[in-house]
Amino acid sequence: MPQSKSRKIAILGYRSVGKSSLTIQFVEGQFVDSYDPTIKNTFTKLITVNGQEYHLQLVDTAGQDEYSIFPQTYSIDINGYILVYSVTSIKSFEVIKVIHGKLLDMVGKVQIPIMLVGNKKDLHMERVISYEEGKALAESWNAAFLESSAKENQTAVDVFRRIILEAEKIDGAASQGKSSCSVM
């Protein structure tokens, strides 16, 4: 097996959309039912995708709102972004658009690995954002999209596998686009 690659992934979104729950479900395989606002946590996990081992460093961020100042640390050495909203919250869906805009302003690249995640899909009766709305938003950003339920462990692993694939796809396109020049 080739040497493992390190990847740093930031998880961003409005408060109480399930960023920490999704991350803990992926890393530890358990759902944390209590809400304890995150300041910033970092988790690590080894995962194999397409025969390649990845050492993931997951930056679970504090919830942002439309007025939050986007910390510059969220743009340094990050290989991919998981933007999370709750399918039960119009506010979180609107705020994720603002966060995306701030992210593009900070990073300065139009093509960055982004995974849009509609979380809490298990709360059928409280749903206010349709699957189609989430998918359309992701397509407008040229981003990957999945809905998830951290509580029911639906697609938590898929979310993190997919962001790795998105990062590798963009890294591959960047390295293919590179040209070299030799001065003799």
Swiss-Prot record:
Reactions it catalyzes: GTP + H2O = GDP + phosphate + H(+)
NCBIfam families, alphabetized: small_GTP (TIGR00231)
SUPFAM superfamilies: P-loop containing nucleoside triphosphate hydrolases (SSF52540)
Propiece residue ranges: 182-184
Main location: membrane
Topological relation to the membrane, as annotated: Lipid-anchor
Cross-link (Glycyl lysine isopeptide (Lys-Gly) (interchain with G-Cter in ubiquitin)): 8
One cellular component term from this protein's GO annotations in UniProt: plasma membrane
Regulation: Alternates between an inactive form bound to GDP and an active form bound to GTP. Inactivated by the TSC-TBC complex via the GTPase activating protein (GAP) domain of TSC2. Autoinhibited by Tyr-35, which constrains the active site conformation, restricting the access of the catalytic Asp-65 to the nucleotide-binding pocket.
Keywords from the named record: Cytoplasm, Endoplasmic reticulum, Golgi apparatus, GTP-binding, Hydrolase, Isopeptide bond, Lipoprotein, Lysosome, Magnesium, Membrane, Metal-binding, Methylation, Nucleotide-binding, Phosphoprotein, Prenylation, Ubl conjugation
Protein name (record): GTP-binding protein Rheb
Residue numbers binding Mg(2+): 20, 38
Motif mapping: Effector region: 35-43
Originating gene: RHEB
